């Protein structure tokens, strides 16, 4: 406060030096007026501190005010008529001095008490300040119109510079854009809350950007952090059916599909399925998933196809075929010319009887029984029934192989038949002929009927 009051005599000294000699006796008048103004200004300051009135003023407005007060001081000092008026009405002179001093004191108090003012609520601070200043000016009895204009301008500047931190923070261009976007959204919604501030959480931020860019339902589903569905681009023509495309779905385990018109329900994987049920059980999730398969239906189709493909094979294998009989006849006929073994005699009997019975298994059994009956008489040792069955199986396999290899039927199959029949003869008639070896270097044949023909 002392430094503020020390500044005041500095402009008054050159003003007192400038005028002529008859105005010099005004100097002692100004000094007691200033001394009287000091306790009054201190009293006003104490009253304002008791009322806890906080005032924040701009420095430029104070400089303009100080210039105006200096010009006001110069004008009464220069004219003696004004000096006489000031002597006659000392209250006006006191009020002009105390305005400047009170302004300086209030500015300094405002600088000191800015931290306290920041702690208070700032919603109605402007109106309170203007009301307090107007009251102070009315009490002092100064020019009310000029002071009101000055105070309003000063408060506008103060509010512009020393506004709330939220207002200062929201003055950036990006935040201005966001405010305009939020106002437009509020006007479109028609709720009347266009100036309402939207929260800046990440979820809301993504919602704002998606709503501004494109208002598609796929982007709006991203607001839910529990379920993300990414769908590739599809043809927009309704007439053409889209190709089967893969849909990647990432969702929580317990989150069921609650929307009937979701992209998952429109997927091509569900094209042939029925209308989804309205139940909220967990089975509905399995019904609507595009990866769901119907294993029973697939097994039924596969088994039907397998049964249809297996049935003709079993029939052809069991039933008689004239081509097979003809092949047997063709392959067995030249064997009579090649050798005269007992197995060839058996095949000769088989060829003669084949026209009577067409069942292939019956023919095999009949041939085995007839051969077994003859071999008992000729052979020394009789073989069990399992060996005869094995021989019949070997012959059946030979017949099947001959059917598959029709290209080399007359050359290779005849040799194979011959060797198989020789082996069969060896199995059915175990005699000393098996143990007779033939030397290719020119050895003599020793009572061997079939072993010397083996290549």
Curated annotation (Swiss-Prot):
Positions of the UniProt region annotated as Disordered: 1-234, 258-304
Residue spans of biased composition, Basic and acidic residues class: 35-46, 61-75, 129-143, 156-166, 173-186
Bias type Low complexity, positions: 1-20, 260-271
InterPro entries registered for this protein in UniProt: At1g65710-like
Coiled coil start-end: none
Comp. bias regions, Polar residues: 213-224
Entry protein name: Uncharacterized protein At1g65710
Organism: Arabidopsis thaliana
Taxonomic lineage of the native organism: Eukaryota, Viridiplantae, Streptophyta, Embryophyta, Tracheophyta
């Amino acid at each position: 406060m002392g430094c503020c009051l020390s500044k005041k005599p500095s402009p008054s000294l050159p003003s007192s030096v400038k005028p002529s000699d008859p105005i010099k006796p005004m100097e002692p008048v100004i000094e007691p007026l200033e001394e009287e103004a000091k306790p009054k200004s201190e009293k006003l300051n104490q009253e304002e501190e008791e009322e806890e009135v906080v005032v924040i003023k701009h420095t430029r407005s104070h400089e303009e005010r100080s210039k105006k007060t200096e010009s006001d001081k110069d004008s009464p000092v220069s004219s003696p008529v004004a000096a006489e008026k000031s002597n006659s009405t000392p209250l006006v002179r006191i009020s002009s001095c105390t305005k400047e001093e009170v302004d300086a004191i209030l500015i300094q108090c405002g600088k000191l008490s800015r931290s306290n003012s920041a702690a208070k609520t700032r919603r109605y601070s402007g109106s309170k300040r203007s009301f307090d200043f107007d009251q102070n000016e009315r009490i002092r009895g100064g020019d009310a119109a000029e002071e009101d204009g000055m105070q309003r301008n000063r408060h506008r500047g103060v509010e512009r510079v020393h506004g709330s931190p939220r207002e200062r923070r929201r003055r950036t261009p990006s935040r201005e854009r966001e405010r305009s976007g939020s106002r437009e959204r509020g006007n479109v919604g028609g709720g009347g809350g266009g100036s309402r501030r939207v929260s800046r959480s990440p979820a809301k931020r993504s919602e704002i950007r998606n709503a501004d860019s494109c208002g598609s339902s796929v982007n709006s589903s991203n607001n839910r952090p529990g379920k993300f569905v990414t769908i590739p681009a599809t043809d927009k023509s309704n007439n053409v059916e889209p190709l089967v495309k893969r849909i990647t779905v990432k969702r929580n385990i317990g989150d069921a599909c609650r929307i009937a018109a979701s992209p998952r329900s429109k997927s091509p994987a569900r094209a042939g399925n029925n209308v989804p049920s309205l139940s909220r059980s967990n089975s509905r999730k399995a019904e609507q998933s595009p990866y769901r398969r119907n294993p029973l239906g697939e097994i039924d189709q596969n088994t039907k196809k397998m049964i249809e493909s297996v049935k003709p094979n079993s029939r052809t294998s069991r039933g008689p075929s004239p081509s097979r009989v003809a092949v047997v006849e063709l392959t067995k006929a030249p064997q009579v010319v090649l050798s005269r073994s007992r197995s060839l005699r058996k095949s000769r009997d088989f060829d003669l009887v084949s026209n009577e019975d067409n069942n292939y298994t019956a023919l095999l059994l009949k041939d085995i029984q007839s051969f077994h009956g003859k071999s008992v008489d000729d052979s020394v040792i009789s073989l069990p029934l399992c060996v005869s069955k094995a021989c019949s199986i070997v012959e059946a396999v030979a017949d099947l192989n001959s059917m598959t290899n029709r290209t080399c039927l007359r050359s290779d199959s005849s040799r194979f038949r011959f060797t198989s029949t020789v082996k069969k003869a060896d199995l059915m008639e175990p005699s000393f002929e098996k143990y007779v070896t033939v030397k290719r270097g020119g050895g003599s044949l020793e009572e061997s009927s079939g072993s010397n023909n083996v290549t």
